């Protein structure tokens, strides 16, 4: 049983699922769902369509260069059945999957390192610019008065300390 890759989104196409388009030059295109097939017929570029794996890899959102990705390559050479080889392969697949998940986590952490601080800055800036939208006008006036009173109290305290 061979699991093919969708030509458009690079998702898995299981046997008996999806659509296959064969061009006049015998080039085969497999699609996992009608969404991919329609986008292909509309001549859309998978690298410019935001939800495809091609876009994600091109824009640095997924790992592109890693040794664990080479285990997924398509191999056309048939191998004689050997029970021990199959068992070793299954064990290796599990080990490779764990390594791949660990590397993907670190890749994601490195990618998201400065994002939280940047988002917080943007939110605070937006709040300061649109303060009148958050609070009603009467509450805003009271808040401004309270800020002025606090500023006056601070000035009085500093002047009394200087005089003594």
Swiss-Prot record:
Q: Where in the cell is it found?
A: Cytoplasm; Nucleus
GO CC terms in record? cytoplasm; nucleolus
Q: Tell me a GO biological process for this protein.
A: ribosomal large subunit biogenesis
InterPro entries hit by this protein: L24e/L24_sf (IPR038630), Ribosomal_eL24 (IPR056366), Ribosomal_eL24-rel_N (IPR000988), Ribosomal_eL24_CS (IPR023442), TRASH_dom (IPR011017)
Keyword entries, A-Z: Cytoplasm, Nucleus, Ribosome biogenesis
Is this entry keyworded Transferase? no
Q: Name one GO molecular function term.
A: structural constituent of ribosome
The record's section on Pfam families has:
Ribosomal_L24e
Description of how the protein assembles with itself and partners: Associated with nucleolar and cytoplasmic pre-60S particles. At the end of biogenesis it dissociates from cytoplasmic pre-60S particles and is likely to be exchanged for its ribosomal homolog, RPL24.
Spell out the family assignment given in the record's similarity comment: Belongs to the eukaryotic ribosomal protein eL24 family.
Q: What is the official name of this protein in its record?
A: Probable ribosome biogenesis protein RLP24
